[in-house]
Amino acid sequence: MNQFKLTLLVALLSSLAIGQQKSSHQSVIEYVNPFIGTSNYGATNPGAIAPRGMLSISPFNVAFDASGREIPLEKDSQWLSTPYVHENEFLTGFTHVNLSGVGCPDLGVIISMPTTGEIKTNHLDYGSAYENEKAEPGYYSVDLKKYGIKTEVTATQRAGMSRFYFPAGTSNVLLNLGLGLTNEQGAMLKFVSPTEVEGLRMVGSFCYNSEEKAYPVYFVAKVSKEPQRRGIWKKHQFYEGLEAQWMGYNGETRMKENFSRAVVGDSIGGYFSYNFKQPTVVELKVGISYVSIENARENLEKEIGEKNFTQVKMMTQRAWEKQLSAVEIESDDENKKKIFYSGLYHASIHPNIFHDFNGDYVKSNGEIGHTEGERYTVFSLWDTYRNYHQLFSLLYPKQQMQMVNSMLSIYDESGWLPKWELNSTETFTMVGDPAAIVLADTYLRGLTQFDAEKAFTAMKKSAETLEDNPLRPGIKEYLEKGYLSVDRGVSGPVSTTQEYNIADFAIGQMAEALGYAEEAKKYKKQSLSYRNLFDKEFNLLRPKHANGNWYSPFDPDKGANFEKNVGYIEGNAWQYAFMVPHDMRGLIQLMGGEKKFVKQLNEIFNNQKFDMANEPDIAYPYLFNYVKGEEWRTQKKVDELLQKYYKNKPDGLPGNDDTGVMSAWMMYGMLGFYPVAPAQPIYTFTSPKFDKVTLNLDTDFHPNGKIEILSNASEGGKYIQQIWVDGKVYKSYFITDRVLKNARQIRFELGENPKK
């Protein structure tokens, strides 16, 4: 039985605990602001979700407004990957499957909407302005101004519940299966009783996925009161010429009351309509599954059943309280605590579970599988290998192990490790071979409860398969020349060479840990081939032709802000200049020594070449720690970036949260350490931002159970003067994962002046 099921069983017994806590120990969830990241393209949403939930209920406000004019942030007018944007003012319903902090649009479907008066089926007609939004972990509420309806929503991992406060008169619950964030189309809906519908909605358009990769989300929806009227609608395709003569409803929307057969189409929906003599509450319960309608119904019955709204909300908030209590912060800075816990909240959304209550799930090959444990999905690995999985290896090792085992199951089913997997569909978004890095990093941090030999075999397959290799395009040239050229059609050949190098280093680390000395030597040597692209004239990595000549003309600045360029993915030569975390000492030598290394780093920060909103350079503020006497620059720069980009406001993220990676960066900066080198179990220090933090570790993995991080941060100093580990002076700015986890206390003395 999984952790969340156990939480559901005990939650009712402790549901009053949150409200009864003494004021001296405020509930952790009260420090979460789900609106952080809903502006500035953070791509989060304030909807209700359980930890690692497969279902979430989010307000949907990214369609055109009621006048039909284009709103500033509308889903089809630009690249918008979220169902909700804080600046928008026109709400057209509540979605039941969503993604958080991703860079491509998908899901955002199964949209419910309460209305009054005549039934309208076009969202431009029935949408409403809104006010009085409130969001907490597991809960969201809003008032619809057009109708005078208050709506509250909550969710479990696989089911959701909405509560609509209708005024007297004609009221309606709409279920729109045509509208959605995804660009995929197609749906089915059927009434199985006056109060229950079942159906499916097609999704799967993530990052230009092909039509062949579309897949269904199944659902069951129930209302708490039997309606006076019910039915479906379908908007028909518009035909011209002879075909149009045979269709009296050509291009029109037809309403079918009391229609009990299945209806199929691209723009369909259902409605429940009431005539209330007095204000009345109607509840809508929805269960989902990626396996079948039957499983969606079972998920709904097992997780919600006859429970009322308050019970469901309290169960989920109790689960969030447990999840977020892995970190205890003692500080008078309420704002920073809210920023931190909101980040931990956002990082606990994806990867999310993909299996049903009974253990069924869709395998990567399309078959139905079964697990007695957990099956996770949404592996944004190009992002998360850099810092996310290290954080969860430390704070939530069981969850990290479940993710690793899910990745190995994907390998069993598809023959390849994941790259950017979504709902058992490999999207092949971004570049590199990031799964290998995550597997090695997890193992080297002491989480070894997975089939390491299988993992090593899978890692080598992607590194050695020369033909039809979906994970490493251009692998043959890479192995022959030691780099990818601009002539073979591989995206971002410089960036991709660097990514392959980091993955090769990880494979070498794994080989060494497993006792394969020769393979360790081979892969670690291979991981240094980025040096073939180092141009001493610029002290940067530069694109090359297959014949060994430099690509010209070379503009190191080209590629910033997603500008198209020849050599790099989502960046330019400056933003990739130091992305060789496994060979920082070697890079220092290549650049001509420590002084030139620091000069080049300062060039990035002093001349606005650093991009806090994307992954390739996010470790750069910590690289000053590799040069003795320059560590203060790391402390200064991390502090500046935290203050500039992380706020307790909707625009409180530097950009797309990338399934929690940007939030993880912030949390490390506030805690005072960062995993600067993936596949190396080390951290490097910076100045913490709280006087006391207790990390409550899982004693099944970390025997000490707790690590205290102490500092005098509240006195205003941001520069490290001294560090103590368990009472002894610690003279290095680097600490291994093992030493950190075995420590009971790490104490920082901070001051106003840098220690040079």
Predicted regions: what is each one?
Residues 1-23:
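Bacterial Sec-dependent N-terminal signal peptides
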Residues 503:
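ATP-dependent phospho-/nucleotidyl transfer catalytic cores
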Residues 706-715:
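Short aromatic-glycine motifs in intrinsically disordered, low-complexity regions
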